[in-house]
Amino acid sequence: MDKNLVQSNSRFLCDDLPPVGPLALGLWRYTTPDIGHATNLLKTAIDLGMNLVDNADVYGLDWGGKGFGTCEELLGHVLSESPELRDQIVLATKGGIQPPVPYNSSSDYLRGACEDSLLRMNVEKIDLYQIHRPDM
């Protein structure tokens, strides 16, 4: 992949964050048990200019009730072993899907979901927190 393509048309999400390119690394299927492989995937994305990392608390859920939060936990292990990577990414995650409800975008639920995401990813802040499929 051409690094210039990934970095073209970068934009700022806010003044406190570095600009992000038009492509993000989506972690929906980021479930490998191999931390080295997971770390390499993140480093490769960064090397290609993809600094926006998109996660969600529900990523990893098998809809049989297992796996909720596993993609965030994996990223947490990667960032624990390679903490220098945290400063190289703009970290986005989502909350609001609450199996079996399925959606809960109440402020109480989202506050707790965000706090749980911080713990799972072993970070002090999330750069962009989004409501995942809001119930309107």
Role assignments for model-derived ranges:
Residues 1-89:
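N-terminal binding-site loop/beta-alpha segment at the start of enzyme catalytic domains
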Residues 74-78, 90, 94, 109-116:
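Generic beta-strand or strand-like secondary-structure segments
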Residues 25, 55, 93, 128-131:
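Conserved beta-strand positions
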Residues 98-136:
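Glycine/proline-rich, positively charged
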Residues 26-37, 95-111:
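Active-site mouth loops of central-metabolism enzymes
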